[in-house]
Amino acid sequence: MSKRKLIPKLSIQSPVLHTNLNVQSTHPPLKKEDLHRISKDSLESDSESLTQEIMCHSEFDDRIRGNGMEPDSLDEEESPRWGSLHEMEEEASGKAAQMAREQNHHTWDQGANNRQQPIEDKYSDLRYDPNWKSKKEEGQLLSVEALPESTDSSLENLPLAPLYPSQETSMELSGGKGEQKESPQSAASLLGSEFLSPNYEHGARRSKPFSELSDSDLEEKSSSLSPYVKSSSSHNEVFLPGSRGPRRRKSKQHFVEKNKLTLGLPTPKTDSYLQLHNKKRGESHPEQISYPVRVTDKTSIQNAKEMENAAIDPEDKWHQRAQQLKNYQEHWSQYESTKSSNVPRGQPSDMVNDHQPSRRPAKLKIRKQCKHQNGLKSSTTEEVTASQGNQNNPPRQQQNQNKPLDTSTKPESIVIMHASNNDVQASRALRSHNLKETSNTFAPPKQAFDKVLSKNSTGCDSGLNVNKERGHKDQEEKRFSYQQLHTLSDMDLNNLNELSKRHVLLSQKGSQFVYHINTHGSTKNKKQLKQPYTETKYRNLEMLWKFHSSSDSQTVRASPDSWLTQIMEQHQQALVQLTDVQPSEGALSSVTLPPILSRVESESQLSSERSQRNQVKISRSNSEGYLFQLEKGKKHKKRSSSKNTKLKGYQKRDVKLGGLGPDFESIRDKTQKLIQQKEYAKQVKEYNMKTLSILSKPQTEKTQKKSAIPRQKALEYAKTIPKPKPSNLTHQASKEQKNPTYAGKEESLPEISLLEILQNRHEREKQAVAAFKVLHIV
C-alpha cells in the first residue's frame, strides 16, 4: 500500500480520506464534442491513471476484507451496510473504467477535427426540470452517505477535514487525476477564462448519488446512517459553512447567472458572508475546527437539531453558527472549570500551540506510515489534539484515569478550542503574517521535531503502556517545546496571552497531584513548568527575549519567587535601555547593562537639572557673563547628549556645575529700583487725581448756566405768541361753494355722439360671433 498517495483537490487544505465511496460528479458524462477538445497526451495519462485507480481500489477492498472490521469503529449491526457500500464502490469503479475506455476509443477514431463544436444545450438550467424534487432528495442522501463510518472515524476526519466542503467533496486516489483534469479543461475551453475562477472549478465538482440504486436501497442506507448524522454530520453543518442542503451546479452557468443579474432577476445566494471572507483570505487552518473532538452528549443533541433547519437562508445560517460557537465556548469553559479541580494536568498549555500548520502534514504522514507498516486497520482514530504518547487511548478512558500521560492531553484539547474560538475574529487578519514569520522561525527545530515524532511512532507501534518509557519521551517533547517558545513570534504570543495564564496555573496545581503517582518524572516536570509561566507573563514585549542570555533557555533550579524577581529586573533593564541604547544583534547575549537608578535618585536628578536651568536663566540677566553662560550651556548639552549614547556616560549623568554663583547685589539693586518705580508711580497717580478734580468743578458750573439760559428764553418767547383762531366754518363754506359749480359742470357737458355708434357696432359683432359658433368655425 506504499504506492497509494492522498492528493487534495485544494493544495492549501489538509487531505481527507473517504474509504467508503467513489464519488462521481453530478453532471452527465462528457460527450464526444467535449472529449475532442482534450489532447492525446492527456488522454494517455488519463487511461494510465484509471488503471492505477482500479488496481488501488481492488487492493484496498481486499485489505479491508482480510482485516475485517475494527471493534471500536463499527458495531455488529452495521455489517450489511458495509457490504452494500463495497458493492456500490465496485460497480462505480467498473463504470468509470468502461466510460474511460469508450472515451479513448471515440477520441482516437474521430481525431481532432470536431474540437470547435459547441455544447448542444447551454441553457438547460433555465428550463423547467420535472424531476427537481427527486434530485434534491438524492443530493441530501449523498451528503449522508459521504459521512465517516463511525464516531471514531469522524474523530479522525474532523481535524483533517477542509473548512469548506462546498469546494471539495472528498479525497481521491492518485489514479483519479485524469478525471479531475478533463472537466475543468473542457469547461474552460468552452466558456473562456474570464468566466472561470479557481473557486469555480472546485465548486463545479459535486458528488452525485449512484443511479443504479433503487429508492428502497437509498431509504435503507439513510436509515442505517441516521445515528451518525446526529453525531458527526451535524458538527460539519454547524462548523463548516456551505455543507447543508443540496449543492447547486455551477459549471457552464456563470454567464447565465451574469445575465440574470443584468436583467434584474432574483437569484439565490449561494455563498454566505463567512464563505466569501474566507475565500478572500485564501487559507484554511485545520486546528480551528479540531476542538469539538471531545464533545459530550449535549453537543451531539444540539447538533442534531441543526438538521431540521437545513432550508434556512445563508445569512441566517451564519448567525446561527456564530451563536453556536459562543455556546460551545461557554460549554467548554464550564467543562474546563469542573475538570480542573478533579483531573491533574501534567502538561503546560503552550505546548500544543507550538505545533504550527507548517509542520502538521509531516506529523500526519509519520503516523499514517507507522500504521500502514504494522498492519493496523484503516478505520482507527487519529486524534490530532491528543499528545504523541497517548494515541491508543480513547477519550472515555482519559476522564477516569489519573496517569500523567493520559491527563496531559486534556489541557491540549481545551487550548486548541479556546485558540480557535478566541482567534476567530482576531487572528484572521494576522494569519498570513504569522505564517510567513513562523515558517522562518521554525525552520531549524523541524528536524528535531521529526526525530521526536519518529520515537513516538515506534512507541505507538509497540503498544506498551509503561510509564517509564513514555515519561522519557514526554520529557523530550516538553524540552523541545520550551525551546520553541523562544522562537515564537510576538503576534502569536499576544493572541494566547490570557489563555495561557489561566492554564499554566491549572497545570501547576494539577502537577502537584501527579507527582505523588508518578515519582519518576516529578523533579523534571517541576523545573519545566516554571519557565512557561514566567515567559507567558512577559511575552508581549519582543525585546525582552533579546536581552535574555543563553542560560535562560535551560531549566532553572532557583525558587519561583527569585526567578520572577530576576525576570522583572531584566524586563526593567530592557525597557530603560531601549530608549537610548540599541546594541547590535550579534552582541545581545554578551551585553551587561549598568544598574538602574532608583526613583529617589531619578527625582533628585530631575530636581538638580531644574535648578541648573534656573541658575542659567538668572545668570543671563548679568550683562557681563551672558555670552559665557550661553557657551557653557551649549557645551553642557553636547556633553550630555554624547554621554547618553554610551554606557559609561549613562552611569555618570549626575554632573556638578562649577563656576560663580548668582550675583545677589545686582538682584538687590534691581529690587530697589522696582520699589522706587512703584512709589513714584503712586505719587504721580495721586497728583493727577488732584488736578483732575480741581479742573472738573468749574466746567460743570458753566455748563449748567449755559443750559438754563436758552430754556428761559424759549419759554418767554412762547408766552408772547398769540393763539390761532379756529378755521372750521371757513372750510365748510368754501366746500359748499365748490360743489355746486362741479355739479353744474357735469350737467352742462355735451353728450357723446360716438356712444351710439359704438353700441351698434358691438351688437353687430355679437351677431357675427354667434354665426361663427353655429358653423363651428370658432
Swiss-Prot record:
Query: What domain of life does the native source organism fall in?
Result: Eukaryota
Compositionally biased tracts (Basic residues): 358-371, 633-650
Composition bias type Basic and acidic residues, residue spans:
118-139, 733-746
Q: Which GO terms describe its biological process?
A: axoneme assembly; brain development; cell differentiation; cerebrospinal fluid circulation; establishment of localization in cell; motile cilium assembly; regulation of establishment of planar polarity
Q: Polar residues composition bias: which ranges?
A: 334-344, 375-389
Q: Name one GO cellular component term.
A: extracellular region
Ranges for the region named Disordered are 62-271, 334-408, 631-654, 721-746
> Which UniProt key words apply to this protein?
Cilium biogenesis/degradation
Q: Provide ranges: composition bias, Low complexity.
A: 223-234, 390-402
Function, in words: Required for the normal development of cilia in brain ependymal cells lining the ventricular surfaces.
Record-given protein name: Jhy protein homolog
Q: Which organism is it from?
A: Homo sapiens (Human)
